[in-house]
Regions:
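N-terminal "first-domain core" detector
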Residues: 1-70
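A general structural signal for short secondary-structure junctions and capping/turn motifs
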Residues: 22-23, 100-101, 109-111
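A broadly used, surface-exposed interaction patch
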Residues: 55-92
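A short glycine-rich, hydrophobically flanked beta-strand micro-motif that places a catalytic Asp/Glu
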Residues: 30-35, 104-111
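Short, solvent-exposed secondary-structure capping/transition elements
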Residues: 28, 62, 98-105, 119-122, ...
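Alpha-helix boundary/N-cap detector
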Residues: 3-10, 14, 77, 81-88, ...
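Acidic, proline/glycine-rich low-complexity IDRs
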Residues: 114-221
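Short linear interaction motifs
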Residues: 12-14, 84-101, 220
């Protein structure tokens, strides 16, 4: 059973904040996947990606986080700093699980839809190889986004993932709550310079010319 302490709930709020600032424009739903795998020598590896559905009435499709700089004309390097900060927050969540004596999860799926914030914790034994990453990505995309495999390779990937999965004895667990804050929309450009990872990071959206909004990271020592 999950022990969602006050600190963990505060981290949930920070995760939401970083997600909202990393997704430009208006959107209806979002799904995020992240894995964190411990290696020897305190080395960690893993991956993170998310997809969101833009709001609109015309035919739509999910947009991948790594497509954002090109689709929204955002400077890629600066945008990826925001994405890295989001992944760092997920690492803090995992560290807090360890501090509270809970079993450490290997991967999570976060969904935001209909003003609900859901976190699904999974404890599978992950190896972190490129084949595993690819197979799981195709499987996950099919499960959560309902994107059907378009090629024999993708169909094989789903079959391979199911066949090679190394489930933990611990069952998946879930946290479900309302969102903590209103979404920030129409974020156009990003400024993430002059900050250090060791500093406390806060976000501030400020209006600029032509009603543009600039996303700044403010650093407090």
């Amino acid at each position: 059973m999950l022990n969602n302490t006050k600190k963990i709930k505060e981290i949930y709020e920070e995760i939401q904040k970083k997600i909202f600032y990393a997704v430009p424009g208006r959107w209806d739903e979002l799904y995020l996947y992240a894995s964190i795998i411990d290696r020897l020598g305190k080395v960690q590896t893993g991956e993170m990606y998310f997809y969101f559905m833009p709001k609109g009435i015309l035919k739509r499709k999910f947009i991948n986080v790594y497509e954002v700089p090109f689709k929204y004309d955002i400077e890629e390097e600066e945008y990826m700093k925001l994405v890295d900060l989001l992944y760092d927050e997920l690492k803090l969540l995992r560290d807090e699980f360890a501090k509270t004596g809970q079993k450490i999860w290997s991967n999570i799926t976060i969904s935001i839809k209909n003003n609900r914030f859901k976190v699904e914790y999974n404890y599978d034994n992950l190896l972190g190889g490129q084949d595993e990453y690819y197979d799981h990505h195709i499987f996950w995309r099919n499960k959560y986004l309902h994107i059907e495999p378009h090629s024999r390779k993708e169909k094989n990937a789903i079959e391979q993932y199911i066949a090679n999965r190394r489930p933990s004895r611990k069952k998946d667990e879930e946290y479900d709550s309302g969102i903590y804050q209103k979404r920030q929309t129409n974020i156009i450009t990003y400024e993430t310079t002059d900050f250090k990872e060791t500093q406390k990071v806060e976000y501030l959206a400020t209006k600029q010319e032509k009603s543009k909004i600039k996303n700044q990271i403010l650093c407090n020592k």
